[in-house]
Amino acid sequence: MVNIEIDEGSGFCFGVTTAIRKAEEELAKGNTLYCLGDIVHNGQECERLKKMGLITINHEEFAQLHDAKVLLRAHGEPPETYAIARTNNIEIIDATCPVVLRLQKRIKQEYDNVPASQDTQIVIYGKNGHAEVLGLVGQTHGKAIVIETPAEAAHLDFTKDIRLYSQTTKSLEEFWQIIEYIKEHISPDATFEYYDTICRQVANRMPNIRKFAAAHDLIFFVCGRKSSNGKILYQECKKINPNSYLIDQPEEIDRNLLEDVRSIGICGATSTPKWLMEECKKAILNEK
């Protein structure tokens, strides 16, 4: 008999849970509700909410909208979004994650407090174009420098002061690699300060996912293709257990992989709904 375990630590983080709850509450009232961008980087959950009536729009469509109600997802938005909402009489339901909100305020404060004469580089370790990163860069009027990997730290100007922050869902390990690299290369005349702004709910999943991956013969990591956090966690799974496979939905399960395994683990990202992992378990059991 095959043992199938769903990782208790996987599933929505509190920021995503709050955003979805707010959307469901509003839709339950029968109101028309728009969401600026995918509410979560998971196609199956987005489809579920679409069936409930949630209308997903992009920033161009948002700018053309008037007298409407719009939900801002957990990733956060730049100041320009709020300015458009005021101009267009858009009622905002702000579901920005409190961890992201605090980070936005810190970066804005850093930017506002730097004298014009002081050429300080505000650096964000994150994914270029990611919704959260766009919101963070927006706090600096587009002046912040985004680096995606430790290798990109080499492009910084080490003769100038550096203030380093991180997207909340990035790898803590890589963040420290960047810190060490900058410390080694910064000019004695320049200052370097860094702030560990990675969400602990995300960071703490790394040791848990390692333990979970090691405990099973086969791992199915359930995650939307757009999930930044999911890519990091899946790579860690694969490192610990080479017999790990990334799937977006139950239909992607390769039945050939189920042969001769005694223990199967199902886990996911902070954007993976529990119900989807349960569906994957059901799909496996139907075949076994």
Swiss-Prot record:
InterPro entries: LytB/IspH (IPR003451). One of its GO terms (molecular function) is 4 iron, 4 sulfur cluster binding. Dimethylallyl diphosphate binds at H41, H75, H130, S227, S228, N229, S271. One of its GO terms (biological process) is dimethylallyl diphosphate biosynthetic process. Binds 1 [4Fe-4S] cluster per subunit. It comes from the Bacteria. Pathway: Isoprenoid biosynthesis; dimethylallyl diphosphate biosynthesis; dimethylallyl diphosphate from (2E)-4-hydroxy-3-methylbutenyl diphosphate: step 1/1; Isoprenoid biosynthesis; isopentenyl diphosphate biosynthesis via DXP pathway; isopentenyl diphosphate from 1-deoxy-D-xylulose 5-phosphate: step 6/6. Isopentenyl diphosphate binds at H41, H75, H130, S227, S228, N229, S271. The active site is at E132. (2E)-4-hydroxy-3-methylbut-2-enyl diphosphate binds at H41, H75, H130, T168, S227, S228, N229, S271. Keywords: 4Fe-4S, Iron, Iron-sulfur, Isoprene biosynthesis, Metal-binding, Oxidoreductase. Its cofactor is [4Fe-4S] cluster. It catalyses: isopentenyl diphosphate + 2 oxidized [2Fe-2S]-[ferredoxin] + H2O = (2E)-4-hydroxy-3-methylbut-2-enyl diphosphate + 2 reduced [2Fe-2S]-[ferredoxin] + 2 H(+); dimethylallyl diphosphate + 2 oxidized [2Fe-2S]-[ferredoxin] + H2O = (2E)-4-hydroxy-3-methylbut-2-enyl diphosphate + 2 reduced [2Fe-2S]-[ferredoxin] + 2 H(+). Pfam families: LYTB. The keyword Iron applies. [4Fe-4S] cluster binds at C13, C97, C199. Its EC number is 1.17.7.4. Belongs to the IspH family. Catalyzes the conversion of 1-hydroxy-2-methyl-2-(E)-butenyl 4-diphosphate (HMBPP) into a mixture of isopentenyl diphosphate (IPP) and dimethylallyl diphosphate (DMAPP). Acts in the terminal step of the DOXP/MEP pathway for isoprenoid precursor biosynthesis. This is 4-hydroxy-3-methylbut-2-enyl diphosphate reductase. It comes from Phocaeicola vulgatus (strain ATCC 8482 / DSM 1447 / JCM 5826 / CCUG 4940 / NBRC 14291 / NCTC 11154) (Bacteroides vulgatus). The gene is ispH.
